[in-house]
Design a protein with these regions (language model features):
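A short, well-ordered alpha-helix in the C-terminal region of glycosyltransferases
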Residues: 379-394, 400-406
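Conserved donor-binding/catalytic core segment of Leloir-type glycosyltransferases
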Residues: 179, 233-255, 261-264
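Nucleotide-activated donor-binding/catalytic signature segment of Leloir-type glycosyltransferases, i.e.
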Residues: 278-303
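Conserved acidic donor-binding segment of nucleotide-sugar-dependent glycosyltransferases
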Residues: 352-353, 357-364, 373-378
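Short hydrophobic beta-strand element within catalytic cores of glycosyltransferases
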Residues: 337-340
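Membrane-proximal helix-turn-helix segments that form the acceptor-binding/catalytic region
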Residues: 135, 146-179, 184-198, 202
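Short alpha-helical donor nucleotide-sugar binding micro-motif in glycosyltransferases
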Residues: 307-312, 404
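Aromatic "clamp/platform" in nucleotide-sugar-dependent glycosyltransferases that forms part
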Residues: 320
């Protein structure tokens, strides 16, 4: 079996990390596999196929297409960080995929002008599309805009020419199977006009094995010492730490930093430390510090993420929408309780008042209540054990990988039988 995994990047963002973990797991199980990406993320030395070839003319052409789409989004007033048509795709990508001749093509996050819907139609191999947001079945939004700015884009989805075109083009791709990491997004995909006739499967993302190996019962000051020695951040040893992770907490409104800020104002912050980690934009880091002066900020490399969670007493994920949140996944794997809103797939990971707290959607008062409830819990080790056991018992890496392998194998078998009947 020959599998080609396709995703925009390989490291940055939840979809990239999930796709890359699956890719690495396939290789570890002797499954012939490649990962095709558009943007190279530093630090990855795995064998991959690249779209942006070492050809200045192709690179120039792809950059021109990206600029054209960005201009179109600007003219139409669409939010660049939450909307993508991917009209043009990348030059020659469908041919590149078909030349590799895979048995299965596993799509993940392929917007951002990586693959156009017409490129997807041209792929000859059966497709398994692991959906990480609404884009595959929406009119272009990744997160419905009514979650972010109060406007409702869902009412006119079926009226847009682009949606009708997208539905029409994808209808020609009969051998397309949908995989949903969360039951929540799976139910939405099943009821969508674009995917209502496709086969659907629920397979959560594979957890990180090294996080599960982290000693979650060790003294938190040990992790704080590691972060200090590596010049990441100096967290106080005499205060409990609440951690919030996001690469772009201000420009990516979906991360819910505005709601966290309001909730933090309702917490007796002099007794606790808020750690804002993962910020990769200096302007946004400065902005966050101006709003919450007593917060600690840091850019955390993926290699030190386990220690970041390990130094925390709880992790808060105040997103407006989540599918199957990587942040929640990682925090629970490291044995840290999580406070988040009861939205999306969050309740598939967080059991209310067992391994964390599910606040009423977008209620900063209840978010603050959740933070205080965890920090004041009489037996924090109980919450930490429950957090880790949730992942160990219900999200086994081996079982989830087996689900993917069985799905891939069944699709290959069906495809081979259809080919024989055609002959």
């Amino acid at each position: 079996m020959k599998v080609l995994i396709i995703n925009f990047g390989s490291r940055r963002g939840g979809a990239s990390q999930s796709a890359h973990r699956l890719f690495k797991s396939l290789l570890a199980n002797n499954i012939e596999s490649k990962m095709l990406i558009k943007n190279y993320d530093a630090g990855s030395l795995d064998p991959k196929l690249y779209i942006q070839q070492e050809n200045w003319l192709i690179n120039f052409y792809n950059n021109l297409l990206n600029a054209a789409e960005n201009l179109l989004l600007k003219i139409l007033g669409k939010p660049k960080n939450n909307f993508s048509y991917s009209i043009f795709g990348s030059f020659g990508i469908a041919k590149m995929i078909n030349d590799y001749d895979p048995d299965i093509v596993n799509l993940h996050w392929v917007a951002g002008n990586m693959l156009s819907v017409n490129d997807i139609r041209k792929i000859k191999a059966p497709i398994v599309w692991t959906i990480h947001d609404h884009w595959p079945f929406s009119n272009g939004y990744h997160v419905p805009s009514y979650h972010l700015d109060g406007t409702n884009d869902s009412s006119d989805v079926k009226k847009t020419l682009w949606f009708k075109y997208k539905k029409w083009i994808l209808s020609f791709k009969n051998d397309l199977t949908v995989v949903s990491p969360s039951k929540w997004i799976g139910n939405i995909a099943k009821s969508s006009e674009i995917f209502e006739l496709n086969d659907h499967y629920h397979i959560p993302n594979l957890p990180k094995k090294n996080y599960l190996n982290f000693n979650h019962l060790a003294d938190k000051n040990i992790s704080k010492k590691v972060l200090k020695e590596k010049n990441i951040v100096n967290l106080p040893i005499d205060k409990k730490v609440i951690s919030f992770g996001a690469m772009n907490p201000i420009s990516d409104k979906n991360k819910g930093f505005d709601l966290l800020h309001k909730a933090w104002m309702k917490v007796d912050s002099k007794n606790f430390c808020l750690h804002l980690f993962g910020i990769n934009n200096n302007d946004e880091a400065i902005y966050c510090k101006n709003i919450i002066p007593d917060a600690a900020t840091s850019f955390v490399r993926s290699s030190i993420c386990a220690e970041t969670y390990g130094a925390s007493d709880l992790v808060v994920v105040p997103s407006y929408q989540e599918n199957l949140s990587n942040s929640i996944y990682e925090a629970l794997s490291c044995g840290r309780p999580v406070v988040a809103f009861d939205i999306g797939g969050n309740n598939e990971l967080i059991d209310h008042k067992i391994n964390g707290y599910l606040a009423q959607p977008y209620d900063e008062e209840d978010l603050a209540n959740g933070i205080k409830w965890v920090l004041n819990y009489a037996n924090p080790k109980e919450l930490e054990e429950n957090a880790r056991n949730k992942i160990l018992k219900e999200f086994s890496h081996e079982h989830l990988l087996e689900d993917y392998l069985n799905l891939f194998a069944s699709i290959c078998k069906r495809s081979n039988n259809e080919d024989k009947q055609t002959i």
